[in-house]
C-alpha cells in the first residue's frame, strides 16, 4: 500500500489538470481519447518495468546493466532521469502551485519555493519510510478531493455526457465538428482544405493526447519501477510473486490516473 500510494503521489497531480488542459488546447476533445488509448498501452509498460525492477532489485538503471548487459545504457538512463525530474518532476508542479498561490493568496513565488523546499527536505531526509507514510496520508485525501471537485463540476453544470463522449471520439478520428451527432451526418472529409484540416486535427489530437498521457501516468518512463522497487520478496519464488503483484498494482495506478483522473 505504501509503494502504491507513493507511486500515485508521483502520477496523480498537476499532469491531470494542466496536462489535460494543454492536450485539449492543442488537440481538441479528441486528445482525451488518445490519452485513454496511451493508457491501455501504458498498462503493459507499467507492468513490465515494475516486474523487472523487483526481479533485478532496482530501477531501470539496474536491470539495464544486469539484465540487458549495458552499463552505458544504465548510466545514460540515470542521467536522463535526473534531468527529467528537474522539469517534468519538479518545475511544473512547483510553478503551478506558485501561480495558484500568487493569485489566490498574494504569496510571492519565492515564498512558495522556500516553503516547498523545506517541506520536501523534511520528508526526504526521513528516508523511504517517511516518504511512504506521507504519501499514504496525502494521496487518498488529495485524490478524493480532486475527484469530488471534478464530479461536482460535471453534475452542477449539467454536462451532457453522451454528447461529450461523441465529441471525444469524433475529434480523435478527425470527424466533422458535429461529431457528437448520431444521425450519420458526421463523416470523414478528405477533400481539399477540409481534408487537410481534418488530418491536421487528428494528428494534433494523437500527438498531444499521447504525450500528455505519458506526462500524467509516467508509464514507460521507469519511475514506477524505482518506487515499487522498495517491495521485495525473500527467495526467488517469493520475489517473482511479489514482482507480479506489484506489476498488477502498477496497472491499477495507470487506470486510476489516466482513465479515472483524466
Predicted feature descriptions by range:
Residues 29-35, 66-79, 113, 233-256:
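Membrane-interface alpha-helices at helix entry/exit sites of multi-pass transporters
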Amino acid at each position: 500500500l505504501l509503494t502504491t500510494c507513493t507511486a500515485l503521489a508521483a502520477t496523480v497531480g498537476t499532469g491531470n489538470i494542466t496536462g489535460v488542459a494543454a492536450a485539449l488546447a492543442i488537440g481538441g476533445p479528441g486528445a482525451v481519447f488518445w490519452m485513454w488509448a496511451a493508457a491501455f498501452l501504458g498498462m503493459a509498460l507499467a507492468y513490465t518495468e515494475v516486474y523487472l525492477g523487483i526481479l533485478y532489485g532496482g530501477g531501470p538503471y539496474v536491470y539495464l546493466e544486469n539484465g540487458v548487459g549495458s552499463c552505458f545504457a544504465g548510466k545514460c538512463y540515470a542521467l536522463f532521469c535526473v534531468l527529467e525530474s528537474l522539469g517534468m518532476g519538479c518545475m511544473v508542479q512547483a510553478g503551478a502551485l506558485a501561480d495558484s498561490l500568487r493569485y489566490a493568496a498574494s504569496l510571492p513565488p519565492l515564498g512558495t519555493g522556500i516553503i516547498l523546499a523545506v517541506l520536501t527536505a523534511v520528508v526526504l531526509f526521513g528516508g523511504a519510510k517517511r516518504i511512504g507514510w506521507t504519501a499514504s496520508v496525502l494521496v487518498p485525501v488529495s485524490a478524493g478531493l480532486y475527484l469530488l471537485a471534478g464530479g461536482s463540476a460535471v453534475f452542477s453544470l449539467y454536462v451532457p455526457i453522451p454528447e461529450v463522449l461523441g465529441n471525444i471520439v469524433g475529434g480523435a478520428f478527425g470527424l466533422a465538428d458535429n461529431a457528437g451527432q448520431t444521425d450519420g451526418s458526421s463523416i470523414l472529409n478528405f477533400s481539399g482544405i477540409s481534408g487537410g484540416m481534418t488530418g491536421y486535427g487528428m494528428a494534433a489530437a494523437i500527438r498531444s493526447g499521447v504525450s500528455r498521457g505519458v506526462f500524467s501516468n509516467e508509464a514507460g518512463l521507469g519511475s514506477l519501477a524505482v518506487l515499487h522497487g522498495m517491495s521485495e520478496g525473500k527467495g526467488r519464488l517469493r520475489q517473482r510473486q511479489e514482482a507480479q503483484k506489484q506489476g498488477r498494482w502498477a496497472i491499477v495506478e495507470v487506470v486510476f490516473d489516466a482513465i479515472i483522473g483524466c
